[in-house]
């Protein structure tokens, strides 16, 4: 499977072990996105939240094409920010649409700095952490002023909460596994 991922990436990235590993990690995350987006879109449709499903599909497409932007000459940092930016905008839209901080998907904001750290290191992670933090404060203020709608309730909220916890746990484990693999590759390169 990794050979397939490697065939997508430009050979020029091989010169720098860190960039090569970051590009591989980005490709794995894009593949996971490609597998999960149809399932998520179907789940939102079954819950009567077609608008959410369409936004997930749109953001997912952007995230899925990021490895191909590397082949088109985009630097790894720009591809990383394209991927994380699509994830971030998706989470902002979902938080606003599904009820602010109480939305069952709000915890997924944690993936923005986690993915940025995995692919780019501490600086991008701190930048995305600051952006996520400011967004959470803005959502809190909007929520307190009554600007946002009421959070979901009933079966849809319960299903989304369950799916969010399980999905976030699985992706956290994947990110940790990729980070561990990247650290091992870096140690071998020394």
Located regions from the model:
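Cytosolic juxtamembrane amphipathic/interface segments immediately preceding
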Residues: 11-22
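Alpha-helical transmembrane segments and their helix-membrane boundary motifs
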Residues: 20-33, 122-126, 157-169
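Transmembrane alpha-helical segments of integral membrane proteins
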Residues: 10, 143-148
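Hydrophobic transmembrane alpha-helices and their membrane-interface boundaries in multi-pass
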Residues: 23-102, 107-115, 132-137
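The cytoplasmic-loop to transmembrane-helix boundary for the fourth helix
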Residues: 119-141, 161-162
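Juxtamembrane or sensor-core-proximal signal-transducing alpha helices
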Residues: 4, 8-11, 166-190
């Amino acid at each position: 499977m990794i050979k397939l991922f490697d065939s997508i990436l430009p050979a020029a990235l091989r010169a720098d072990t860190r960039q090569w590993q970051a590009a591989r990690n980005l490709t794995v995350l894009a593949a996971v996105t490609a597998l999960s987006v149809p399932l998520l879109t179907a789940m939102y449709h079954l819950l009567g939240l077609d608008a959410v499903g369409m936004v997930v599909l749109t953001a997912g497409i952007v995230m899925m094409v990021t490895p191909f932007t590397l082949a088109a000459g985009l630097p790894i940092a720009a591809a990383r920010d394209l991927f994380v930016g699509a994830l971030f905008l998706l989470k902002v839209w979902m938080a606003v649409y599904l009820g602010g901080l109480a939305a069952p998907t709000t915890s997924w904001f944690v993936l923005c700095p986690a993915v940025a750290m995995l692919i780019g290191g501490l600086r991008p992670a701190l930048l995305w952490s600051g952006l996520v933090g400011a967004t959470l404060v803005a959502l809190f203020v909007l929520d307190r002023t009554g600007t946002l709608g009421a959070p979901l309730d009933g079966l849809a909220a319960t299903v989304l909460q369950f799916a969010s916890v399980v999905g976030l746990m699985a992706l956290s484990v994947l990110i940790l596994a990729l980070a561990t693999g990247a650290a091992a590759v870096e140690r071998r390169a020394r």
